[in-house]
Each structure stands twice: as C-alpha cells, then as structure tokens.
Amino acid sequence: ATMLCFITTDAGVSRDVLELCVQSGVKSSFNCITIDGDMSTNDTVLVMANGASGVKLETPEDIYAFQQALAHVMLELAKHIVQDGERVTKFVTVHVTGGRTEDEAKKAAEAVAKSSLVKSSWNGNDPNWGRIIHAVGYCGAKVDEEKIDIDIAGLAACRGGVQADTPSDDLRQA
C-alpha cells in the first residue's frame, strides 16, 4: 500500500532547517518500518511549516527541540502505519545493540525485520530464535556469534549464541 503522511506546523522555520529536521526524522522512523518488505514508489512524507504562530526557530536550542519533537511525531505515526497494515496481527520492535558500526546494526535489524521466516515464527507464536540468528548471519555484517544475545519480549532466548534457560512455553506466551 502507499503511505502518505502529512505533518503541519505553525512554527517559523527556514526551508533548509526544516529539510534537515525532516531527513533526520524520516531516517529514524519511516525508513525503519516494514510490513511486507515492499515500498511504493509513491510513499510520501510531507512536512509544511507556515510560521503563523509567530514563533521563529533561530537558536540551536530551539531547532534541536523542534527536531526532537518532529522526530517523536514521525516515530509515532510510523508505528501507527505498521499497526494499521493489511493483515497485521503483531507489532514487533527489533533492537540491535553492540554492532561494530551503526550501519552493520541497521543491516542486522532490517534482515530480522524483513525475514519471512522470522515473521512466520512471530505470527505463529513460535519463539524460534534460530531464525533470528540466521537472519543476522546472512545480513552481511561481521558478526561474532558468541556475542549474540536474543531477548523475546524481555525474556532471554539466546545467550552467547546458544539457547538460554528460559522455558519455550514462557517465550511463546511473551
């Protein structure tokens, strides 16, 4: 499906600053979601600022506060888009920490989030952490499997690349 997102503000912000804020916000929100792995050529995020409030964003502190608020709005809207997706029954957030670089961590997160096998296990309430580790393995990032820990809903599924002591039934119910 095509995603159309329109955000308006009455703050007075220059076009250049607004563009930077939008790019930063999109990078950490809309560009991090996936439902079916497809992207429409018409997906759009449009932010308009008319300055009608008379509040001008000129200081670095004001611009930073605006950027943070805009990023928060974008993240919440991105979450809603996922939750409203066609045939969506689960909402899962993938967090990768300890990657060698931010790009490698993002590659690993995207591989897990887009994996049909991982999605199938989530949909079937099957805590198959092996599918997660498999997706991380093929993502192209350099990985030390002995350092991989996987939690499912806050419960340890894998520690140091091997199965943790958490009972499978507990993971299924998580």
Show where each model-derived region lies:
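A structural signal for small-residue-enriched, beta-sheet-centric alpha/beta enzyme cores
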Residues: 1-174
